[in-house]
């Protein structure tokens, strides 16, 4: 009998028919099968391995090709196995047991297995050939999501064997086109994912490195986003450097719906470019790397699909909070200075977007007061880029200094759209009254008022009143006999003719001046028509009525009188426009505007519905009037009853007037006698009076009181805005040469340009005092405070025109006065026409006094 432990007949096992098929299961085990060097596991381990094998590959080796939905729904795979070629049904991974004919046969086989080997017999079976692992999108995405580099073993062999790449459609997310690289970047652990370098190495070996790195999202929501965008958003500089070194596109544009402004349905607009994303997320270290790396540098002058540069993007994300304004302004200066050093011939701040807006104009249009104030008051001490400053100190003496503000883009003198016009004429800017109080805007408006605004305004008041008096006289003393046009024979007739000509000319003048403002420049929306452009709209209607009146008069139509009286009423109402010149009456006109276009409009809309509904019901209760046939020819004195005794064809319109009289308490109930059901008629009338006279009228009074209260609280700001509008209206009415004559400011040489030539700019001077920072004024132009003749800077001698000679004599008394009661905080007080009390009131949040 053979020795049970003698393995001599081991060679016969391979050819034995009773060889168990379950012993081949170890060929498919990857992670759980020990290496040959490891000791063999006992029977419990083998049983556990079979159990795990069933759980791992449950459903993985079904007959036939897998269904697509099964691949999509699969999420976790412990091991990846390539299905072998079509096999027989018994070639299964599951252990169904060994086929045995008789128990003794099994016993005999076991004794032969352990017999001692015989010399020259066949050795053990060689190691099985390596099995190629299979990878698909769910498996690959799961591996990179877990950050398991071991799971990527065999991926390169699989791709090379099947001639595939990681950018193929089978490895992309169907809905977004996302590859495994963005998936890995979106699943970082402590800022790292060890599968990313392996994926890049595999892509490089398969020959599609750039395509793999720059593969964008293709869905509508995230279209254009690349792995570089995600690495920047995740604030991973090491991966940003790795991607750029491998060839990432530093100018890729993310244009999906998610990356659009909020008012267009988006969530976060950052300017589409990777550099803009780094700037808008406050990552200066990445900004420095993208613009200074030795592989591919990002161009600071690059614009997105809207034409916005990185500076526009910073303005777009500003929200006027302290934290946001602090980092936005710091990043803004960083990029501006960096661009000036990298591209000396380009002023990044002067580039316009597709809407024709610079970053400064965009800040004004969107009401970003924090970044707006920073731009117009920017002062740079670095001599190499000092030409980027918009504020220059002319002289300083202790806490007092005189500053020169660059007026480029602020006040363009009609040559192009200015920031001042954007602030005044754009009603969508909710905080524009605050932005108008920022220096030098505030002092600039005062200077315009002193130079030409006040005189022109009062001349306009007198001229308009004279024109309206003439219009009233020609309407009152018009001829009563004969059809128009009336003859001109006497001196009075010729005076009337002169008055008619003057009235017609004023109508034509108002027509052309206001049609330009309404439909070309000032009023882009309906709200602007009825709020900011209310008087322009009324003047336009008045001019149309005057022109129509003249046409009907010359055409011999007597109905010209009906049109003329409407024009006369509207003309006198338009005189309220000139109440803007004084604070006392200016606030009153604003109250009237808001009540008319807000409260009264809503009241009339509801009241009209009530009146039509009740009139229809009440008229239906009246008995119809008898027809004219009821009076026979024998009754010559027969008279037909009419309203209010009965209902005829004119009853509805007459009844509407009666209901209005009831609303104001002047009506009667004569029609009650002719009602078919007097009780129902009385009930309807009582409910109508309650709803209109008691409810609606009192609601109107309450709303009007609320509006008056709101206007009173903001009367200073609202009136100042109207005052600024009046100044610009007067300036825009001047021809271009007069605008240049009355332009505020002075031409000053503030230093040297980038090419070494004198940097001459049109600046506006504002005297200020700062009690916290003394002797810290860098870059002062003039050594002698208050000197107005000449000054030296960079070796150039310049003459300053139109500089006030008595400036120093007015500054010193103000400083002495301020020194009596000065707060300890950092206070900058403009020393123009603004008083000391106004400066303190602004600092403590109170309403300052009138600038006039």
Curated annotation (Swiss-Prot):
Binding residues for Ca(2+): 668
SMART domains: ANK
Entry comment, domain topic: The ANK repeat region mediates interaction with Ca(2+)-calmodulin and ATP binding. The ANK repeat region mediates interaction with phosphatidylinositol-4,5-bisphosphate and related phosphatidylinositides.
UniProt-recorded name of the protein: Transient receptor potential cation channel subfamily V member 4
GO cellular component, one term: plasma membrane
Membrane spanning residue stretches: 456-476, 494-520, 534-554, 559-579, 595-622, 680-708
Catalytic activity: Ca(2+)(in) = Ca(2+)(out)
Sequence segments annotated as region (Disordered): 30-51
ANK repeat windows: 223-252, 270-299, 355-387
Organism: Gallus gallus (Chicken)
Keyword list, A-Z: ANK repeat, ATP-binding, Calcium, Calcium channel, Calcium transport, Calmodulin-binding, Cell junction, Cell membrane, Ion channel, Ion transport, Lipid-binding, Membrane, Metal-binding, Nucleotide-binding, Repeat, Transmembrane, Transmembrane helix, Transport
Effect of residue 183 to A: Strongly decreased affinity for ATP and slightly decreased affinity for Ca(2+)-calmodulin
Record: residues binding ATP: 178, 183, 187, 222-225, 234
InterPro entries in alphabetical order: Ankyrin_rpt, Ankyrin_rpt-contain_sf, Ion_trans_dom, TRPV, TrpV1-4, TrpV4
Similarity comment: Belongs to the transient receptor (TC 1.A.4) family. TrpV subfamily. TRPV4 sub-subfamily.
Cytoplasmic side: 1-455, 521-533, 580-594, 709-852
Keyword Transport attached: yes
The organism's place on the tree of life at top rank: Eukaryota
Higher taxonomy: Eukaryota, Metazoa, Chordata, Craniata, Vertebrata
Positions of a 1,2-diacyl-sn-glycero-3-phospho-(1D-myo-inositol-4,5-bisphosphate) binding: 235-237, 282-285, 330
């Amino acid at each position: 009998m053979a020795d049970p432990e003698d393995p001599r007949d081991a060679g016969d096992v391979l050819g034995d028919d009773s060889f168990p098929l379950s012993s081949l299961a170890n060929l498919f085990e990857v992670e759980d099968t020990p290496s040959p060097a490891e000791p063999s596991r006992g029977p419990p381990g083998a049983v556990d391995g079979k159990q795990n094998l069933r759980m791992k590959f449950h459903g993985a080796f079904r007959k036939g090709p897998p269904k697509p939905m099964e691949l999509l729904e699969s999420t976790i795979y412990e091991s990846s196995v390539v299905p072998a070629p079509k096999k027989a049904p018994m070639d299964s991974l599951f252990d169904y047991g060994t086929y045995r004919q008789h128990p003794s046969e099994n016993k005999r086989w076991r004794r032969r297995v352990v017999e001692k080997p015989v010399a020259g017999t066949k050795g053990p079976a060689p190691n099985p050939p390596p099995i190629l692992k299979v990878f698909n999108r769910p498996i690959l995405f799961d591996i990179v999501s877990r950050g398991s580099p071991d799971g990527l073993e065999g991926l390169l062999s699989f791709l090379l064997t099947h001639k595939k790449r990681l950018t193929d459609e089978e490895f992309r997310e169907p809905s977004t086109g996302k590859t495994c690289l963005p998936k890995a970047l979106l699943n970082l652990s402590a800022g790292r994912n060890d599968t990313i370098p392996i994926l890049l190495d595999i892509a490089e070996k398969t020959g599609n490195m750039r395509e793999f790195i720059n593969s964008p999202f293709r869905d509508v929501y995230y279209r254009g986003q690349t792995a570089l965008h995600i690495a920047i958003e995740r604030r991973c500089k090491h991966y940003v450097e790795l991607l750029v070194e491998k060839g990432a596109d530093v100018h890729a544009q993310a244009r999906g719906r998610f990356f659009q402004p909020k008012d267009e349905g988006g969530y976060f607009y950052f300017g589409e470019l990777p550099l803009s994303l780094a700037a808008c997320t406050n990552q200066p270290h990445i900004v420095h790397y993208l613009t200074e790396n030795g592989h591919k540098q990002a161009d600071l002058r690059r614009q997105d699909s809207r034409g916005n540069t990185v500076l526009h993007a910073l303005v777009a994300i500003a929200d006027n909070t302290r934290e946001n304004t602090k980092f936005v302004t710091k990043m803004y200066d960083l990029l501006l200075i960096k661009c000036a050093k990298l591209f000396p011939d380009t002023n990044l701040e002067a580039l316009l977007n597709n809407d024709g807006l610079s970053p400064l104009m965009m800040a004004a249009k969107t009401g970003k007061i924090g970044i707006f104030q920073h731009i117009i008051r920017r002062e740079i001490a670095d001599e190499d880029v000092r030409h980027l400053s918009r504020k220059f100190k002319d002289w300083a003496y202790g806490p007092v200094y005189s500053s020169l503000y660059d007026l480029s883009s602020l006040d363009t003198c009609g040559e192009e759209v200015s920031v001042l016009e954007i602030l005044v004429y754009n009603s969508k800017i909710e905080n524009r009254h605050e932005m108008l109080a920022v220096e030098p805007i505030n002092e600039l408006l005062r200077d315009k008022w002193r130079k030409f605004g006040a005189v022109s305004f009062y001349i306009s008041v007198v001229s308009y009143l004279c024109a309206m008096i003439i219009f009233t006289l020609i309407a009152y003393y018009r001829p009563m006999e004969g059809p128009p046009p009336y003859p001109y024979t006497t001196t009075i007739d010729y005076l009337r003719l002169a008055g008619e000509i003057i009235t017609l000319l004023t109508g034509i003048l108002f027509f052309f001046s206001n049609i330009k403002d309404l439909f070309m420049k000032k009023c882009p929306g309906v709200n602007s028509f009825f709020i900011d452009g209310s008087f322009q709209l009324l003047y336009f209607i008045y001019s149309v009525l005057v022109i129509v009146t003249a046409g009907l008069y010359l055409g011999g139509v007597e109905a010209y009188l009906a049109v003329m009286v409407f024009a006369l009423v509207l003309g006198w109402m338009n005189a309220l426009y000139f109440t803007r010149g004084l604070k006392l009456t200016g606030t009153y006109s604003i109250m009237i505007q808001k009540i008319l276009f807000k409260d009264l409009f809503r009241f009339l809309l509801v009241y009209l519905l009530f009146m039509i509904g009740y009139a229809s019901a009440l008229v239906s209760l009246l008995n119809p009037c008898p027809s004219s046939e009821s009076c026979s020819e024998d009754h010559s004195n027969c008279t037909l009853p009419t309203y209010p005794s009965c209902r005829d064809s004119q009853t509805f319109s007459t009844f509407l007037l009666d209901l209005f009289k009831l609303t104001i308490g002047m009506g009667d109930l004569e029609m009650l006698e002719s009602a078919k059901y007097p009780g129902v008629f009385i009930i309807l009338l009582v409910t109508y009076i309650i709803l209109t006279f008691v409810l609606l009228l009192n609601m109107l009074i309450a709303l009007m009181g609320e509006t008056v209260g709101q206007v009173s609280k903001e009367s200073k700001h609202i009136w100042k805005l109207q005052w600024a509008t009046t100044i610009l209206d007067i300036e825009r009415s001047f021809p271009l040469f007069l605008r240049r004559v009355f332009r505020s400011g002075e031409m000053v040489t503030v230093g040297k340009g980038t090419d070494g030539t004198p940097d001459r700019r049109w600046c506006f001077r504002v005297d200020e005092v700062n009690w916290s920072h003394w002797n810290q004024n860098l870059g002062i132009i003039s050594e002698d405070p208050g000197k107005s003749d000449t000054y030296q800077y960079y070796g150039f001698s310049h003459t300053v025109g139109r500089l006030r000679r008595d400036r120093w004599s007015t500054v010193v008394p103000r400083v002495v006065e301020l020194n009596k009661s000065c707060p300890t905080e950092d206070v900058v007080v403009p020393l123009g026409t603004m008083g000391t009390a106004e400066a303190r009131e602004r600092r403590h949040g109170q309403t300052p006094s009138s600038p006039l």
